[in-house]
Amino acid sequence: FLKNEFCFAPLATCPKDIELLNKQYDKFLTGSDQIWNPYNLDTFYMLDFVKEDQKKIAYSSSIAVSRIPEEQQDIYKKYLSSFSAIFCREETGSKVLSALTGKTVKTVLDPVLLLDENSWIQFSHKGSLVNRISVSTPYIFCYFIGDKDFEWKALETIKKQYGINRVIVFSVAPPTCKIVGYEYLQSADIYDFVWFLH
């Protein structure tokens, strides 16, 4: 997937190589889901390695909280104040970051929503499971990161509420117990994931 859909710069893992990126690029873009969540903060995503004279932009960045803990506010001010532009995917996040940095932080769409329906359909047709698993009858598609009882209970409630019996489950961790009649996917790529959602 990554090789097909992205054009990557050479991998930079040591501080010296990361520092050299400043000579190779004149603009740096960061963003997306929870990159600035204070409970899992890594200043790398605040582009701490980028020199002051370089242009830094954050698109659809996310903090996923309604306030930044006081003991971390100086970190946010230090690194985000030098950004040329900050766009956040959450309205609350935009307000919090504006107040901290003194910058105008606009709220924008999640990048997933920037493509139209036809583009997503074309994308999904690249999957390995397309046409191998029928999607012509109604189904509930579940994506589980863990294996928690409340998720399975919620699934049963949804099945009853909508009268849909077919369930397709993709789980990162193998479920501890498999419910008879459900379809379990052990390997689905990103294209397949989108295929099941459309």
Which residues fall in each region the model found?
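Aromatic- and Gly/Pro-rich donor/ligand-binding loops
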Residues: 1-78, 125-126
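Structural motif
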Residues: 26-27, 55-57, 85, 110, ...
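Catalytic donor nucleotide-activated moiety binding site of glycosyltransferases and closely related
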Residues: 60-65, 96-97, 144-145, 151-189
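A conserved, positively charged/aromatic
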Residues: 77-81, 197
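A short beta-strand/loop micro-motif in the catalytic core of glycosyltransferases
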Residues: 83-90
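Donor nucleotide-activated moiety binding/catalytic core segment of transferases
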Residues: 105, 109-113, 117, 172-198
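A short helix/loop element that forms part of the nucleotide-sugar donor recognition site in Leloir-type
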Residues: 119-134
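Conserved donor-binding/catalytic core segment of Leloir-type glycosyltransferases
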Residues: 131-146
